[in-house]
Amino acid sequence: MHIIKTIKVLYREIKILKKSNKKIGLVPTMGNLHDGHIKLILLAKKYSDIIIVSIFINPMQFDNLSDLKNYPKTFMKDSIILKKYHVDILFFPHINEIYPNGIEHQTFVEVIKLSKILEGQSRPGHFRGVTTIITKLFNFIQPDFAFFGEKDYQQLLIIKILVKELNYMIKIISLPTIRLKNGLALSSRNNYLSSQENEIAPYLYKIIKKTCEKIIKEDDNIRPKIIHESKILLIKKGFSVDIFDIYDYKNLEHPSKKVKKVILLASVWLGNTRLIDNKKIILNY
């Protein structure tokens, strides 16, 4: 595995790979790798000749400085994992390489509408940071494919819009959420959970599933009551609820009666840890 820390060296390597007509797959990460990342790498291998994983803890997408400071930095462990799974290139740049003039003076890229709602409303500037670093990585690496998990569904949708509207010739491939046996969605932030919170956290997906089952069975006019009861149940379990509702699968607007494909999005706090999850539903009209 070739570890690259500068854009100049990365450009040189990409130029060689492009001349050889190699299909490049990109898996962007912030490190602290888990089984979800590994599944993305294995998926990338099915499509790509060359696998590039980036590790960059992007300060531009953090709305909380203490969250940025406390984010796990596990480069040695991560590099061992990436070597084990035969990743070709690890791009591990310093912050000054990505933002040489500082974040305050950085030109940014933003998908206007979707970046302002739901998670974007709760975390101002977060998605602007995501789309800016993803745009930079796409420009540096020029991948044929890029791989993202479906747990961060709003982020996935935003990146798909970014690719379409900026005319990138990149295929975005998503991976269904990877879960522990108890149903908890894998996330680097799960490391923040205390032992007691780890016992409570799986209830999030259990309640999501139950809610979806009820929504499918009941009439439209009962839906607000079902959502409200689920929020109360989450609060009783110890969660603080930020987002818990169903949205149009394509645009995250509140669904009209004609829309069949919807998604239940959940964003909650458990102690000091933010957990997000979702489940797709096909409504029976």
Swiss-Prot record:
It is an enzyme of class 6 (ligase). It catalyses: (R)-pantoate + beta-alanine + ATP = (R)-pantothenate + AMP + diphosphate + H(+). ATP binds at residues 30-37, 149-152, 178, 186-189. It holds the Pfam family Pantoate_ligase. GO terms for cellular component: cytosol. The keyword Zinc does not apply. (R)-pantoate binds at Q61, Q155. Its EC number is 6.3.2.1. The active site is at H37. The keyword DNA-binding does not apply. Pathway: Cofactor biosynthesis; (R)-pantothenate biosynthesis; (R)-pantothenate from (R)-pantoate and beta-alanine: step 1/1. Beta-alanine binds at Q61. Its main location: cytoplasm. It is found in: Cytoplasm. Keywords: ATP-binding, Cytoplasm, Ligase, Nucleotide-binding, Pantothenate biosynthesis. GO terms for biological process: pantothenate biosynthetic process. Catalyzes the condensation of pantoate with beta-alanine in an ATP-dependent reaction via a pantoyl-adenylate intermediate. The reaction proceeds by a bi uni uni bi ping pong mechanism. Belongs to the pantothenate synthetase family. Homodimer. NCBIfam families: panC. This is Pantothenate synthetase. It comes from Buchnera aphidicola subsp. Acyrthosiphon pisum (strain Tuc7). The gene is panC.
